[in-house]
């Protein structure tokens, strides 16, 4: 893009200069004016955006009109007059034909050689702040234009005798040469700026720069050393007529040989130097001081730029091979710096964006982890609650089962105790009654005291019958209550089995009791049975209120503990033991469970068996 923006206005400027060259440079004396034109064009080409006018006179620095220069192209005195000159010298004097002009030219060239070289370099280079790629092409263009003008300058004496038409044809021919030589640097694009950077001092640097910049092809580069030699020899010698003759011969034979072309360019350079010196003299009369100061400042700036470019090229040769000057290197460095800064900014922005993205991801991950942890904690709590509720329900169920087992065990134990107490009390009462009756009968038979034996037997039988009746009533009540509880607890199977075993046990007890009764004497047994039956009826009446109280208490306390049953059983057993005088409560109870009331069966058995016996 940079090359496009540079070359498009350059091409337009070249076209404008090539059109205006034969018109404004007919006399060949406004060399400084053409250089100023091109310098002004390239300093304001980006601001104005339009090429210079066709005549090229609107941007002149001397303030003269173009009509004043182009009034009479055939008049040699008008064409050779420099703008701002007050001495009115003719062209021959200005070109050094007279000794005075020659001495002035030599003196001016010797005394102000460095200044003129610096001025010429400043004018040819144009604005020093532009890249040297532009300056190189500008120098070639300006030098080509000045070459064409100085071909006519060398023939200024001949132009006095020639008509204006011939001069115009010569100008057109020179314009064609300038366009031809102008197109060659555009196609080759040879870097020519660095030659001036390696110059050791001001004079040789200026001479080499002018030679290298004004030579568009290889032949001109070969003849640069010859040009230096010719410049020094021309300054030392006063043979100006030979130079003009060589200019004329070069103009006539400029397409014949390459050597002649190089000589022609060398002579044109010499005439350019002289015309430059003369223009400097004429400008000293009016405003040459300001121009010289500006040009000296520009030359100093250009020298400093050249020194800077040397160091820059040494540091950045591998990066700046295609660049022609330090200014272009600086511009490329600035572009590279901008690119680096832009890339660094992009990298920093990308890095910040990545950091933000990673932070957002981390925060999102943390939030997700927090949510997952919360969900996990909630699920764990929920599982714990469920497990606790399950455990609680299981514990409740186990407690209920244990309670049921305890109740069944308590019922079984109570039934066992009842059956044991029944069997024990029954057997004891039987044994006691039989033993007492037997002993009493024996004692009666021996002592013949029937009354005593009867009283003893009656007392013993009364006590035995009372205890038996109480135990029977209590057992009836407990057995009835235990039946109700067992039916509510849905333990029918175990109860039925236990009832079967209990019936078997009671049957065994019945058999044993019947056998025992049979072994006793029939008299004592019959008397005891009658007495016990009579007393049983009386005791049953007395025991009914106590049994009713028992049932009322147990219906009110359905959820009684096993310990209460055990206490009741122990209390009843203790009472029975106290009455009998034996430790029936301390006897082991290991018989199986039963639900049926065995007292009635046993009583019935006794009642039925006794009369039979």
From Swiss-Prot:
Keyword Transcription regulation present in the record's keywords: the answer is no
- Any idea which UniProt keywords this protein has? Secreted, Signal
Q: Where is the signal peptide?
A: 1-20
Q: Where is this region: Disordered?
A: 42-613
Q: Mind telling me which GO cellular component terms the entry cites?
A: extracellular region
Composition-biased stretches, type Basic and acidic residues, lie in: 62-72, 117-132, 147-193, 206-284, 291-449, 467-482, 509-521, 538-554, 574-607
Which is one GO molecular function term here?
Answer: calcium ion binding
* Coiled-coil regions listed in the entry: none
GO BP: any one term: otic placode formation
Question: In what ranges is there compositional bias, type Acidic residues?
Answer: 450-465, 555-573
Reported function: Essential for the formation of otoliths in the inner ear of developing larvae and for the perception of gravity and acceleration. May be one of the organic components of the ortholiths.
Additional facts recorded: Otoliths are structures composed of proteins and calcium carbonate that are found in the fish inner ear in contact with the otic epithelium. They are essential for the perception of gravity and acceleration.
User: What is the designated name of this protein?
Assistant: Protein starmaker
What species was this sequence derived from?
A: Danio rerio (Zebrafish)
Q: Which gene encodes it?
A: stm
């Amino acid at each position: 893009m940079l090359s496009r923006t540079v070359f498009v206005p350059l091409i337009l400027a070249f076209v404008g200069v090539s059109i205006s060259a034969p018109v404004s440079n007919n006399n060949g004396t406004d060399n400084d004016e053409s250089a100023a034109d091109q310098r002004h064009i390239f300093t304001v080409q980006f601001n104005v955006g339009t090429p210079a006018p066709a005549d090229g006179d609107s941007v002149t620095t001397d303030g003269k009109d173009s009509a004043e220069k182009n009034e009479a192209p055939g008049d040699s005195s008008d064409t050779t007059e420099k703008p701002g000159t007050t001495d009115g010298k003719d062209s021959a004097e200005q070109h050094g034909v007279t000794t005075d002009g020659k001495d002035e030219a030599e003196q001016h060239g010797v005394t102000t050689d460095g200044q003129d070289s610096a001025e010429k370099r400043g004018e040819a280079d144009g604005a020093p702040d532009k890249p040297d790629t532009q300056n190189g092409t500008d120098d070639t263009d300006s030098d080509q234009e000045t070459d064409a003008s100085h071909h006519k300058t060398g023939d200024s004496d001949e132009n006095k005798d020639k008509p204006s038409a011939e001069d115009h044809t010569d100008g057109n021919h020179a314009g064609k040469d300038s366009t031809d030589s102008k197109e060659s640097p555009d196609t080759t694009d040879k870097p020519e700026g660095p030659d001036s950077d390696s110059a050791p001092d001001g004079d040789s640097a200026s001479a080499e720069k002018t030679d290298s910049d004004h030579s568009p092809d290889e032949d001109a580069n070969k003849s640069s050393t010859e040009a230096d030699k010719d410049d020094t020899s021309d300054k030392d010698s006063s043979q100006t007529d030979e130079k003009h003759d060589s200019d004329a011969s070069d103009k006539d034979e400029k397409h014949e040989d390459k050597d002649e072309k190089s000589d022609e360019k060398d002579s044109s350079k010499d005439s350019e130097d002289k015309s430059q010196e003369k223009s400097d003299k004429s400008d000293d009369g009016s405003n040459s001081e300001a121009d010289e100061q500006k040009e000296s400042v520009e030359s100093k700036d250009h020298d400093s730029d050249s020194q800077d470019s040397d160091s820059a090229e040494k540091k950045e040769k591998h990066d700046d091979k295609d660049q022609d000057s330090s200014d272009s290197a600086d511009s490329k460095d600035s572009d590279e710096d901008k690119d680096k800064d832009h890339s660094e900014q992009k990298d920093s922005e990308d890095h910040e964006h990545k950091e933000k993205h990673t932070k957002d991801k981390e925060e999102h991950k943390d939030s997700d982890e927090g949510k997952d942890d919360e969900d996990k904690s909630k699920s764990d709590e929920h599982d714990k609650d469920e497990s606790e509720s399950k455990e609680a329900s299981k514990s409740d169920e186990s407690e209920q089962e244990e309670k049921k087992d305890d109740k069944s065990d308590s019922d079984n134990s109570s039934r066992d105790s009842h059956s044991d107490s029944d069997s024990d009390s029954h057997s004891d009462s039987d044994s006691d009654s039989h033993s007492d009756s037997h002993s009493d009968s024996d004692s009666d038979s021996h002592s013949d005291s029937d009354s005593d034996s009867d009283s003893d037997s009656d007392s013993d039988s009364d006590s035995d019958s009372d205890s038996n009746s109480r135990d029977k009533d209590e057992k009836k009540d407990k057995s009835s209550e235990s039946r109700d509880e067992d039916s509510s607890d849905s333990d029918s199977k175990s109860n039925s089995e236990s009832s079967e075993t209990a019936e078997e046990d009671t049957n065994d007890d019945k058999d044993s009791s019947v056998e025992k009764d049979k072994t006793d004497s029939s008299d004592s047994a019959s008397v005891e049975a009658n007495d016990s039956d009579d007393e049983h009826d009386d005791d049953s009446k007395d025991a009914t209120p106590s049994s009713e109280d028992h049932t009322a208490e147990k219906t009110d306390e359905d959820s009684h503990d096993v310990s209460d049953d055990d206490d009741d059983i122990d209390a009843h057993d203790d009472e029975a033991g106290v009455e009998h005088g034996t430790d029936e409560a301390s006897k082991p109870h290991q018989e199986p469970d039963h639900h049926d009331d065995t007292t009635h069966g046993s009583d019935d058995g006794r009642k039925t068996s006794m009369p039979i016996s």
